[in-house]
Amino acid sequence: MSTKVVNVAVIGAGVVGSAFLDQLLAMKSTITYNLVLLAEAERSLISKDFSPLNVGSDWKAALAASTTKTLPLDDLIAHLKTSPKPVILVDNTSSAYIAGFYTKFVENGISIATPNKKAFSSDLATWKALFSNKPTNGFVYHEATVGAGLPIISFLREIIQTGDEVEKIEGIFSGTLSYIFNEFSTSQANDVKFSDVVKVAKKLGYTEPDPRDDLNGLDVARKVTIVGRISGVEVESPTSFPVQSLIPKPLESVKSADEFLEKLSDYDKDLTQLKKEAATENKVLRFIGKVDVATKSVSVGIEKYDYSHPFASLKGSDNVISIKTKRYTNPVVIQGAGAGAAVTAAGVLGDVIKIAQRL
């Protein structure tokens, strides 16, 4: 029976954060995971002496009733540094501000598990600082930044550690854009309009509150930046390579999401034409992120695929990533749910377990 104890500090109790906490508190393990901090923007639960917070499954009520203000991040680092046991910080937010403190956490020996893409897809200097592997640094795991709980990042890191070399990666990295193109461009002829599919996707909750945040391609660009960097391409930033936006120029600046959706149908013509051209070649349209390690090139945009291609037969909002390496000349294909609270939280919890095993 292991006597290993790790202290877990959690920031964010939203949709993913809630699923993570429920999974963490229900988990059975030979390692003891003590929840010592639970923080939201304004209020928090904090154990000053690092004894486990006695909240159990009632953590929501305990947090809602708390009158303790959330510590500024510098103060939080100073507090966690004094922990007698190793600390894992779990950031379940998408905050760029919190991500900006990751290097400080890590340099103070605090490990990080997170689905937050911001730090890993920002400037290259931050990436290098986070993975400098200084012996006193905390560990950094971010499986859920690409493909939610799918084992994409862990697979890439593992094969590279064993001496394999990534040659090409291409894939459908966005659950939202997967759904939209799977409905819009099919092997069976259809008259579905792009604008109508976007409206349905929003109704079903697949898109961000403002669908332009999906259609601008930046979310895919961030994910491609991450897998590109892992594969050895020094991608400067998500805006340093070609990213095709699906937002018609005149609609980029309209004030509201409702106005955008209302006017989107005025611009269906170009994508309808592209769909028809693809159909005459027995192909479908998909929104793809690509990395070519040999040419150090990265891109995001619409591509055509034969009806027989794995990307063409995709259903729903699945992600699918194809990875070609020196050893895997026939590409490895990883497919499954690339979004959703439960699978994302499981990806984060898996990272917490991996870190704990190394501490």
UniProtKB/Swiss-Prot annotation:
EC number: 1.1.1.3
A Pfam family that the UniProt record links to this protein: NAD_binding_3
Positions annotated to bind L-homoserine: E208, D219
Secretion signal span: none
PROSITE patterns (alphabetical): HOMOSER_DHGENASE
Note: Present with 48900 molecules/cell in log phase SD medium.
Function noted in UniProt: Catalyzes the conversion of L-aspartate-beta-semialdehyde (L-Asa) to L-homoserine (L-Hse), the third step in the biosynthesis of amino acids that derive from aspartate (the aspartate family of amino acids), including methioinine and threonine, the latter of which is a precursor to isoleucine; production of homoserine leads to a branch-point in the pathway as it can either be O-phosphorylated for processing to threonine, or O-acylated for processing to methionine.
The protein, known as: Homoserine dehydrogenase
Gene: HOM6
